[in-house]
Amino acid sequence: MWTFPVEYDVIVIGAGHAGCEAAYCAAKMGASVLLLTSNLDTIAKLSCNPAVGGIGKGHIVREIDALGGVMAEVTDLSGIQFRILNQTKGPAVRAPRAQVDKQLYHIHMKQLLEQVPGLHIMQGTAEALLDDGEKVLGVSTKEGWAYSGETVVLSSGTFMRGLIHIGTQNFSGGRLGDAASLGLSKDLKRLGFPLGRLKTGTPARLLSSSIDFSIMEEQPGDQNVCFVHREEAFVPKLPQVSCHITYTTDKTKDLIANNLHRSALYGGRIEGVGPRYCPSIEDKIVKFADKDRHHIFIEPEGLNTREVYVNGLSTSMPFDVQYEIIRSVAGLENAVITRPAYAIEYDYIQGNVILPSLESKILEGLFLCGQINGTTGYEEAAAQGLIAGVNAVNKVLHRPAFIPSRQESYIGVMLDDLTTQVLDEPYRMFTSRAEHRLLLRQDNAGMRLSHYGHALGLLSSERYAMFQKQKNCIEHEKERLAKTFRKYGDSIVPLTKILCRPEVSYQQLLTEFPEDVKDWGPIIGASLEMEIKYSGYISRQQTLIRSMEKAENTLIPEGIDYHSISALSLEAREKLSKFTPRTIGSAARISGISVADIQVLMVSLKKDAY
């Protein structure tokens, strides 16, 4: 087998969202990088929904930007609708989401990658890893040649032994229209990696000209929403479009109930476990039988196509049943299908075989990121790609691994969860997974993480200076407003106390006290308002973090009867009894154990003087 005459610092296998981020970041750090993909025309392809962000996910993309990654920039360049979700709820759960033009997203990502010095993008299909039994040495390809590398980042997506299901029909594929990867699974088994099966799915695509939008609810975008941190208000590069909302009907329920045996999922033909929080329409009908109808979102796939994505109608039903189900939905009575819905099973690596750096415990120098680790979602994959790419370079340079903590980032929450829990279903990020989410808002990602990005060489000095300016400005202004007293009602109070009132916004404070309050613009003003309004809660969370850090290594005595601690949640009592953790820290990392449970446990240990 011929070996390519260049030895790379980092070889990245797969150019999905994890692979692109890994290759980009590794090359930006000065490494020589090979990005190996089976098809150059599907780089960063949005295989499922044409959107980036959302609850928890939008926070991750903002963190990627704060660290110097690329996903946020490509999203802003490709966005055709931007929104803030949960606007009526607290600041911790507000999150940006963008509809993107699928084709432009691919084009912009490919263009950005092509401009990075030291990054070689090559079409080829990885067939096996090269190793000496202990350390990875490179990769061999299906085409018959090999590449040598100090480290390898494997981001295989849904391609490892991918099996597509449409009703009773199934066939090999990494996604519809693309071949599966068969060799890598076999090779990972050879090396001793435990493989399992997971499942995901995608709905049909329809022709927009065949849809009756007049009976649907229009869902326009919001102003001044973006993913890249900026000093000025954001103006989208592309024309902006609306999404639309419709609903299933009684006919939809009847069609699914009568054909459930023909579903690949319910017919017993799918072995893998699907994502709990992204169920198929047949799953919804079965598990939520009491609901009369379900939301369906019609989302444009791009500006230069009439195809739309039918969010909420994912299914593995046969095509003839899909046809009837789609036409049972209000406004879709005459819908023309352009691509069928399908489910896909794929291999992932089971068990706790990765370090928090995302390096494999089994083969030195091999880093794993994305769906191969059991996650689902573009954003989760991209964040892992950034961490894997950075740490592959750190490995080559003999530097310590970069591992952000769960107290300072959603990326840290995910890394901790992936390396301390055994996943039995696809992992998706939600704000509820973070114990200190008020500290991890999407608006303060730059202030939390930009110093890491700058130190790693990913974030330019200019952008780092912008983040520092914003941080210093907010800290200084908080202090100044706290020392500025004015009459409000019958009392003389500091301006911070006035702003803490729920009905008072920073803009109102600026209008009422123009000589005392500075206009820092909408971006800094919004962050400043949140920092002041929620200062009490933020302070308590910071105190709790310090307390938890102090208690991390506190021993839990053997034989403790968790069922006797009535203040613990039922789930906590069951799981603590099952796993019998030795320390408070290990107890806190068990899936389903909340911060409140840990606090109850700590109080109980002190009270009973174990």
From Swiss-Prot:
GO terms for biological process: tRNA methylation; tRNA wobble uridine modification. GO terms for molecular function: flavin adenine dinucleotide binding. Transmembrane segments: none annotated. One of its GO terms (cellular component) is cytosol. It holds the Pfam family SAM_GIDA_C. It is found in: Cytoplasm. Belongs to the MnmG family. NAD-binding protein involved in the addition of a carboxymethylaminomethyl (cmnm) group at the wobble position (U34) of certain tRNAs, forming tRNA-cmnm(5)s(2)U34. This is tRNA uridine 5-carboxymethylaminomethyl modification enzyme MnmG. The gene is mnmG.
